[in-house]
Amino acid sequence: YGLGARVIGVGECGVTVHGQEETPLFPNSPILTEEQMKNLAEGLNELGRRAKRKGMKVCFHPHVGTGIQSLEEIDRLMELTDPELVGLLFDTGHSTIAGENPVEILTKYIDRVGHIHVKDVRREVFEQVKNGDHSFLWGVKNGMFTVPGDGNCVDWDQIFNILKSSNYEGWIVVEAEQDPAKADPLEYAQKARAFMRTQLGV
């Protein structure tokens, strides 16, 4: 807070598999019980109340390999949490890997979005994870994610049109999540910077 942070990004980490390198992602993606979902929502509302007293906002990050990744799961969590206390951290890459349309999620929840992560997906690697016995970490290490404008899954024109026509004033954070030995960080940072300048004019 003392450094100017006003958003707290949080995620569900109680039943996750995304950090397990030997665990195939899709056959083992966790599903929360209704009791677990309600407990999570209750905890988020309480955290949101405490954050609000400090002038901060809690934003929940749906993440592949956790109990909240699908649109159905996002819908249920948003239904159970107070919009004044809990916002949404929107991530183009994770919503795509979860099998959802990020444009649909952003359209539906733009008024609750308080923080944004943008990254693209390489379909050929994603398909190997989706159809094989590969883990989330295997996918990351093998280039499943890349910077905006370098992949072939996210409809960036629609994403940015939604943002430009909204009242969103928060951060848009570019993520790459790639092996730096295979994808030079400077090269990809420059590629992302050029793409973001084209889309946003900044």
Residue ranges of predicted features:
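Active-site acidic/histidine proton-transfer and metal-coordination neighborhood
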Residues: 1-88, 157
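Short, flexible loop segments at the rims of nucleotide/cofactor-binding pockets, characterized by
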Residues: 64-65, 93-95
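Histidine-acidic metal/acid-base catalytic patches
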Residues: 45, 49, 53, 71-90, ...
